[in-house]
């Protein structure tokens, strides 16, 4: 089964929300709700407000995303 077409955008975490979700402001000034990817949870990578992250989104719902990478 082929993986869906995903869109990746860099952004900055602006707010921490319950249940490992975050409000992320993308570089194109849009704000979305994003949750951490499973590998980030498994490896216990912490995401805090102000962190630069890479967000993966589907073209079907551009208001939600998945945080796949935290820049150092």
From Swiss-Prot:
Q: What keywords are annotated for this sequence in UniProt? A: Cytoplasm, Initiation factor, Protein biosynthesis, RNA-binding, rRNA-binding
Localization recorded for this chain is: Cytoplasm
Q: Which GO terms describe its cellular component?
A: cytosol
**What InterPro entries does its record include?**
NA-bd_OB-fold, RNA-binding_domain_S1_IF1, TIF_IF1
As one GO molecular function, the record gives: rRNA binding
Pfam hit, one: eIF-1a
Q: Where mainly found?
A: cytoplasm
Q: How does it assemble?
A: Component of the 30S ribosomal translation pre-initiation complex which assembles on the 30S ribosome in the order IF-2 and IF-3, IF-1 and N-formylmethionyl-tRNA(fMet); mRNA recruitment can occur at any time during PIC assembly.
Report the function annotation for this chain: One of the essential components for the initiation of protein synthesis. Stabilizes the binding of IF-2 and IF-3 on the 30S subunit to which N-formylmethionyl-tRNA(fMet) subsequently binds. Helps modulate mRNA selection, yielding the 30S pre-initiation complex (PIC). Upon addition of the 50S ribosomal subunit IF-1, IF-2 and IF-3 are released leaving the mature 70S translation initiation complex.
Q: Which family does it belong to?
A: Belongs to the IF-1 family.
HAMAP family assigned = IF_1
User: What is the protein name stated in its UniProt record?
Assistant: Translation initiation factor IF-1
The primary gene name is infA
């Amino acid at each position: 089964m082929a993986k869906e077409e995903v869109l990746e955008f860099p952004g900055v975490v602006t707010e921490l929300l319950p249940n490992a979700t975050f409000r992320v402001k993308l570089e194109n000034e849009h704000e979305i709700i994003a949750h951490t990817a499973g590998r980030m949870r498994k490896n216990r990578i912490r995401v805090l407000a102000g962190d630069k992250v890479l967000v993966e989104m589907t073209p079907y719902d551009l208001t939600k995303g998945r945080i796949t990478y935290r820049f150092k």
